[in-house]
Curated annotation (Swiss-Prot):
Keyword Protein transport applies: no
Taxonomic lineage of the native organism: Eukaryota, Viridiplantae, Streptophyta, Embryophyta, Tracheophyta
GO molecular function, one term: metal ion binding
Miscellaneous field: Contains 4 cysteines arranged in two pairs in such a way that they might be capable of binding a metal ion.
Residues making up the signal peptide according to the UniProt record: 1-20
Keywords, ordered alphabetically: Metal-binding, Nodulation, Signal
Matches recorded under Pfam families: Nodulin_late
Example GO BP: nodulation
Name the UniProt record assigns to this protein: Nodulin-14
Length: 61
């Protein structure tokens, strides 16, 4: 039963890691992200792109 719990925790953590698997785009020269950034499977209304450590990362609302 303990192995089952560990297996579920492992699967959940792998799922959460795969959700954030979006290729990073370098920031523009003005420390902003390109306007044409979009992810086909997620509506743009739910995402907010921001420049962090010279790469564009997304945050969900």
């Amino acid at each position: 039963s303990l192995k089952f719990v560990y297996a579920i925790i492992l699967l959940l953590s792998l799922f959460l890691l795969s959700m954030g698997n979006i290729p990073l785009v370098p920031c523009e020269t003005d420390d902003d992200c390109p306007m044409e950034m979009s992810i086909p499977s997620i509506p743009n209304k739910l995402l907010f792109f921001m420049c962090w450590e010279k790469e564009c990362v997304y945050r969900r609302w």
